[in-house]
């Protein structure tokens, strides 16, 4: 039954989520400590189509922190293009990489690096990124409701709280 709900959810979110221009993702820098393994990310970030790798640093978008430190147009384009390509490659999948707390980590990393990613983006790219964020927001909220208490991580709690705040939901 859970698989059925996931399939329905994926179909609904991929077709019917509309980008609300009133939702703002700028200046949401809440991350204080950086636990990114830069040596591991450096080993794959310059490879072609690295978004296809089954690597947790790719699937939770930890590479965004490395790209941000790399800076410049190269880092921005590398980040943005790989987010878009990763999403196109994985948006219809039901299980991996939409398991555990990967969705929550991705959402947190996208939000934290949003200003960096969009600094040289055109309107269409910003709209696409907002749609990707909203898919993650709805996915986090949906998965949080159906997760067993023992499966919830601190990333899930942060992402769920952030998701509800973004959507303006009452947290009571």
Give the residues covered by each predicted segment.
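Aromatic-lined, polymer-binding surfaces characteristic
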Residues: 54-172
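Extreme N-terminal leader/anchor segments
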Residues: 1-53
